[in-house]
Amino acid sequence: MKTRQNKDSMSMRSGRKKEAPGPREELRSRGRASPGGVSTSSSDGKAEKSRQTAKKARIEEPSAPKASKQGRSEEISESESEETSAPKKTKTEQELPRPQSPSDLDSLDGRSINDDGSSDPRDIDQDNRSTSPSIYSPGSVENDSDSSSGLSQGPARPYHPPPLFPPSPPPPDSTPRQPESGFEPHPSVPPTGYHAPMEPPTSRLFQGPPPGAPPTHPQLYPGNASGGVLSGPPMGPKGGAAASSVGAPSGGKQHPPPTTPIPISSSGASGAPPAKPPSAPVGGGSLPSAPPPASFPHVTPNLPPPPALRPLNNASASPPGMGAQPIPGHLPSPHAMGQGMSGLPPGPEKGPTLAPSPHPLPPASSSAPGPPMRYPYSSSSSSAAASSSSSSSSASQYPASQALPSYPHSFPPPTSMSVSNQPPKYTQPSLPSQAVWSQGPPPPPPYGRLLANNNTHPGPFPPTGGQSTAHPAAPTHHHHQQQPQQQHHHGNSGPPPPGAYPHPLESSNSHHAHPYNMSPSLGSLRPYPPGPAHLPPPHGQVSYNQAGPNGPPVSSSNSSGSSSQASYSCSHPSSSQGPQGASYPFPPVPPVTTSSATLSTVIATVASSPAGYKTASPPGPPQYSKRAPSPGSYKTATPPGYKPGSPPSFRTGTPPGYRGTSPPAGPGTFKPGSPTVGPGPLPPAGPSSLSSLPPPPAAPTTGPPLTATQIKQEPAEEYEPPESPVPPARSPSPPPKVVDVPSHASQSARFNKHLDRGFNSCARSDLYFVPLEGSKLAKKRADLVEKVRREAEQRAREEKEREREREREKEREREKERELERSVKLAQEGRAPVECPSLGPVPHRPPFEPGSAVATVPPYLGPDTPALRTLSEYARPHVMSPGNRNHPFYVPLGAVDPGLLGYNVPALYSSDPAAREREREARERDLRDRLKPGFEVKPSELEPLHGVPGPGLDPFPRHGGLALQPGPPGLHPFPFHPSLGPLERERLALAAGPALRPDMSYAERLAAERQHAERVAALGNDPLARLQMLNVTPHHHQHSHIHSHLHLHQQDAIHAASASVHPLIDPLASGSHLTRIPYPAGTLPNPLLPHPLHENEVLRHQLFAAPYRDLPASLSAPMSAAHQLQAMHAQSAELQRLALEQQQWLHAHHPLHSVPLPAQEDYYSHLKKESDKPL
């Protein structure tokens, strides 16, 4: 979805790229949407198609279409199956997200409205929106569903799909939405879910903060508070709205900045907000209305606010409704921005804020109240529709889309959505909202088109009547805002787009944030004159307003009108123009383009297929067309919200009110579609639509203008929800009665009828058969039962045995651990005290490291004698195998200090084979017991403490002068210790043996341990032998080795020093002792630290190649011959002690050192052979 959205964004960004495809895509989208829509309902499908077409045209981008289709489908599906199938919802949502095109959104919108209508006119609107988005944006559901959530989930918004997945969230969002929709809990909830989801995405997107749908809604409402309604709606559709209205500034203040301006708007629109409260109340009264109040708070406020807004707008430059709108846009934008910004999180709620704003907007629209009103109408309806559509569009396209649908769902959601939805989908949602409104006006398709055009062309905008007013302003602003918004959107939104349309909007804080804030922005937008025209447009406008505020107040106006779309500048660009396109290019792009383009497309589509689109309006144009019709339709659907809410207040008959508002602006114009739909039918249809929206009729009613087409689709849409429920209703078959009577007998079985369902029956669930005793079937069953029983018994026995074995193993492990601890303690006590600080911890490691260095350094191996390599072959399978790179061969070689190894090797190898064998067997048994599972854990723990000290001591003591003298010991110990974790630890594990080496398999560890134990036993038993080895053989061997390997080792040491990995490995491991000394502090410590991990790798790779060659070399070569000799002599006593301690330690931690043993053994054999050679 995100990709799609981005793509959409890109498309949108491309400007009209989306738009161009709009018509064609529109059709295609329609077709596509149809599938999604179809899923939803015939009507829905059509509407969806139309909307999708528009949306797709806008969003056409694969994402858009898919999103559209999915969005629509989902929305529809959600609406219909919202209650019936949350899963479906999710599916739908997924579906929706895929399309998530404005069309889809529209469809969703329309569907949402219809579906919502099904559930509850207004609520359904909201619900659908909520639900659809919810469903549709389960992942983003909350996003859309909950304005708050949406906002909060604003980011989710970008990923509609996620919203998809979070169907669950939709409910939450739904619920939050409910709060948001405080008006219509029931519808609210689903709407909330839906709306919120839609919106949230937007909201979320750009308003991640408002995770809480409530906040969002509150914001929305608070934003609306700006429109009073917002706050009010959350408070209570009525009281809250009224309070909001009154407290709009205050409430609006919830997002003070946005609210403040909105309050201004809101203040201006305060009346509207009060209207909105009425809307809320009415909405509350009318479910459709209720959500609309919530949703429509903008709308409703929009409606009332149109007057207020007018003031606001006037204040804002609402006079022109366009000019004012821009200012309102600006003002709202500030609001929106403030609100959007501040309320961005609340942004979704901002929708309501927008609502207030829209109210103000409507006033602005007051100039063009008709259009604005119409938008309010449309906005209300359209807003709902547009919101829905927008939401749908946005939701589809974006979470915003969802958000949009959300607010189309309910205006609060729309607002929210616009804000929330639109925030994410700002431009688009806004545009869609506006476009929808625009297109809602498209009821006068012209307006839709005009709207689109207006968006695109301010000129056409005027024709859009109310929308025109809003849109004309919007167009101008659209471009302006679109552009600014675009800029904002682009600039801000552009980046944010991915994040969320809203964010970009949000980014373009000014208006984008606000558009994102869309809700806030919407609030702004709402204040936006067009806001009134489009409540949702106010959304849009808010968005735009935001945008407008941002860049172009006009855009704001446009924003309002287009803001839905423009809100996402994207939307606007398409709808409005290039800027819109540009705006739209950016995140909103998909939405915007979808919105804008779709707006254009949708508008065009609406214009073109206002009937179809209107019908489809719910689906797509319904965003606009639907918005218009939706204004009618939504008005009808939402109008209830609006009408009941604000409309009642402002336009009591939202349709009428809307009409009033819309008609004021361009009742005729806007009215044509919206009034037509909204005014006449809308009032009825509005409430009815919203109300009826649930019922397909409502939808159509919703779109009287759209009626032809929209009615067609909306009914289908509405039917779809029922359809979904119908299956649940499933069948008329009488309830099953338990009869348990034999119904049939065959040779082998007797069939009993367990349940009697009257004329229906299910062989699977209603009948069961009992095999006759003598039959084959009975025998088979008996055999099967017996077999199962036997198997179960056997399994139980085996399990018990395994349990006992595990217990034994655990006991052995514990014993091993205890022994290991004891040996570690001894080793630590012995060595740690002396070299504990610097060598103590590291000592064990260093010894291992030498070995590991040896094993680790392939160069040594490569250069080393073939004989060593051959010898290493013996151990290679375990020790050297890459799989066992942690094997002793690594560390095994280094596991026992090279010095010790050298000393021990002679003793081990020189010791009587038979004795050694016996010792090995004894040690093997001992090790096996200890090694089992216990050491693996302890070793790691001990490794740093014990393993490190022992080996570290060894290496350092051995090379005590060298290692300790350089001071690397200290570094080593600590660097090792610190870095020891990874590097040293592995080395320790390697050196310490299997116990410390988790990499080794148990078998490998045992083998290594055994070898190590043997060697250690041979050597350990005879300290003198070990000393002898240390002093004599090791030196002897080392000398010869030193000569043969010294170059290599030194080179390696140098390489190690120079090479990050090698320095660690070489200095520490291969040439670790000498190298360490030569490159003691810097190279070794640092390499170790930096290469703890690397060394492991190096050990693994180089070890394989050079572990054995290195081992002898590492013993002798790592240090210069002189160094080694000096170290060995100087520390021969120390080495002896270390050897003993190490042996003890190893014995205690056989696993640790065992593993090294195999490698060591090879190493020893190598050393022995080599020593023999040189010797």
From Swiss-Prot:
Any one GO biological process: multicellular organism growth
Extent of Low complexity compositional bias: 240-253, 262-273, 378-396, 547-584
Tissue note: Widely expressed. Most abundant in the brain.
Signal peptide: none
GO cellular component: anchoring junction; cytoplasm; nuclear matrix; nucleoplasm; nucleus; perinuclear region of cytoplasm
Residues spanned by motif Nuclear export signal: 1018-1026
Keywords (A to Z) from UniProt: Acetylation, Cell junction, Cytoplasm, Isopeptide bond, Methylation, Nucleus, Phosphoprotein, Transcription, Transcription regulation, Ubl conjugation
Predominant location: cytoplasm
Motif Nuclear localization signal positions after renumbering to this chain: 16-32
Modified-residue entries (Phosphothreonine), positions: T638, T654
Chain positions covered by the region annotation Involved in binding BAIAP2: 503-553
Site (Cleavage): D109, G110
InterPro entries with a match to the protein in the record: Atrophin-1, Atrophin-like
Name of the protein in its database record: Atrophin-1
